[in-house]
Amino acid sequence: IKIIDTIWDEKLCKRGMINSWQTDIAKKECTGDWLFYLQADEVVHEKYLPVIQKRCEELLNDKEVEGLLFAYKHFWGDYYHYHNGHGWYPYEIRIIRNNPNIHSYQSAQSFRYFEYYDNPRQETGTRKLKVAKVDAEIYHYGWVRPPNLMQNKCKALNSIHWGKEKAEEYYNKAPKYFDYGPLSQLAFFEGTHPIVMQNMITNFNWQDKLQLTGKPNPYRELHKHEEFKYRFLTFIEKHFNGGKQIGTFKNYVLLKR
């Protein structure tokens, strides 16, 4: 493991672009044919490692393939509930070719090919990567925290996107604890977690602060998955579209490989 010391310039935090710039700093230090990118709240189950390695070997000389697309499980509130509805990205690029023209895009959720590089959110001179699927999932634990720490995270995250002053003003009036809402509206996880997560799961101690059933608190803003629009789209997708999301933005071109 190589740790790179960098300076986070708050002047560059507009719309989360600092995340992409920091990602590119790490990318420049990498060697090898493929680069595997994970954010701090993302984990790969050890059962997928042989699958990922085999897929990289299979596609190594297929230069049209610029990246590999992973499925996602977005856990919410605890380690037993996850999002599988409209509005949460079901796939994302997490392995890319070691190509200097490929850069982290927007606020570092994904990657693009840049003909020339000015900033992560530039409107021209970029195109989507051509990718192939890999039969593996990324487990995203970014929304599994004690409610007080989750609220702190939201404040920090929005400081990067909104600016520190606006975030301070908003969260000074917000509740101290994040309200996950009724977890019964989500899918229940029946699989196993990665071995590296076992200590975190053993120390899970905020069950009594979660709402398992009932209706959302009417005095707070609804989460996206609680809004009628998203619940309706999720119903249509699951019952009439094979679970595939309708009309969502895909930052990639999927190849048949």
Predicted feature locations:
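Short beta-strand-to-loop acidic/aromatic patch adjacent to the donor-nucleotide binding site
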Residues: 32-45
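Catalytic-site signature of metal-activated, phosphate-bearing donor transferases
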Residues: 16-20, 24, 43-257
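Active-site-proximal specificity loops/subdomain of glycosyltransferases
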Residues: 1-34
